[in-house]
């Protein structure tokens, strides 16, 4: 159980091949982030006797919205929060947001951060430390453990600028990505920087966790600043070179 503020907790539900659906719980209520499929999420919520208050959608891909419509059939009062620019691709949204919007859920203030790159109109959700013991970021497919999302719709410049935005958050921000890619990303980073002690140590640590059936996530922004080559790329040219190299790389 993570991200505590009294009974404020965040839980992972592992689905599909490598997706993670994060469930943020406060008292008897829950918020779900990017539900790929409905079955495991619905089962988990019902077993815990939780009421679904909202679903946060970072972008339109099926492995992020695939379970939403079934979940809102079970909990029709739940809000579906998504970018107002994505009405066509997320037509079932009921609470539309834009860059820098701030809204409240379950006694927490959430800020919307527009992060183009992986897709157009991709958004991230940020909860500041005044509402929890640490800052919390749900970046969707923009920022991963040791990596970033592929550029499926956006440009290198857009993704570089999006990562710059996220890198400006406080270093104690906990990062809750939507995929378990950390091991592969760190192996790739180590292939480029084989003497990087921070990457070596982090890879060993998360491999031990994975061997025990644990998740490598969440990470922290502080940790990513030491080991995420995309996040610390000094310019767009360097970022573009890294992204092209990663796209061709095979573990």
Curated annotation (Swiss-Prot):
Binding site for Zn(2+) 1: 59, 61, 118, 141
Coiled-coil residues: none
GO terms, biological process: methylglyoxal catabolic process to D-lactate via S-lactoyl-glutathione
Alphabetical keyword list: Hydrolase, Metal-binding, Zinc
Pfam families: HAGH_C, Lactamase_B
Cofactors, names only: Zn(2+)
Top-level taxon in the UniProt lineage: Bacteria
Protein residues bound to Zn(2+) 2: 63-64, 141, 179
Cofactor note: Binds 2 Zn(2+) ions per subunit.
Pathway(s) it belongs to: Secondary metabolite metabolism; methylglyoxal degradation; (R)-lactate from methylglyoxal: step 2/2
Keyword Metal-binding applies: yes
GO molecular function: hydroxyacylglutathione hydrolase activity; metal ion binding
InterPro entries: Clx_II_MBL, Glyoxalase_II_hydrolase, HAGH_C, Hydroxyacylglutathione_Hdrlase, Metallo-B-lactamas, RibonucZ/Hydroxyglut_hydro
Biological role: Thiolesterase that catalyzes the hydrolysis of S-D-lactoyl-glutathione to form glutathione and D-lactic acid.
HAMAP family: Glyoxalase_2
Oligomer and partners: Monomer.
Protein name stated in the entry: Hydroxyacylglutathione hydrolase
Protein species of origin: Prochlorococcus marinus (strain NATL2A)
């Amino acid at each position: 159980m993570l991200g505590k503020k009294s009974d404020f907790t965040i839980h992972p539900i592992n689905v599909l091949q490598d997706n993670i659906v994060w469930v943020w719980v406060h008292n008897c209520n829950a918020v779900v982030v990017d539900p790929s499929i409905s079955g495991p999420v619905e089962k988990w919520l019902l077993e815990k006797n939780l009421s679904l208050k909202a679903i946060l959608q970072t972008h339109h891909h099926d492995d992020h919205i695939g379970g939403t419509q079934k979940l809102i059939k079970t909990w029709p009062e739940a809000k579906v929060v998504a970018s107002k620019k994505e009405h066509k691709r997320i037509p079932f949204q009921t609470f539309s947001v834009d860059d820098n919007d701030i809204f409240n859920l379950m006694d927490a203030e959430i800020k919307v951060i527009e992060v183009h790159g992986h897709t157009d109109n991709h958004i991230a959700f940020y909860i500041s430390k005044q509402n929890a013991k640490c800052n919390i970021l749900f970046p969707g497919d923009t920022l991963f453990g040791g990596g970033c999302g592929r550029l499926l719709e956006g440009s290198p410049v857009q993704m570089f600028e999006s990562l710059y935005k996220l890198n400006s958050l406080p270093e104690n921000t906990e990062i809750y990505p939507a995929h378990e890619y950390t091991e592969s990303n760190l192996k790739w980073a180590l292939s480029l920087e084989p003497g990087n002690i921070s990457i070596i140590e982090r890879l060993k640590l998360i491999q031990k966790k994975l061997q025990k059936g644990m998740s490598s996530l969440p990470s922290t922004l502080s940790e990513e600043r030491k080991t995420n080559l995309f996040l610390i790329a000094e310019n767009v040219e360097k970022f573009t070179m890294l992204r092209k190299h990663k796209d061709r790389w095979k573990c």
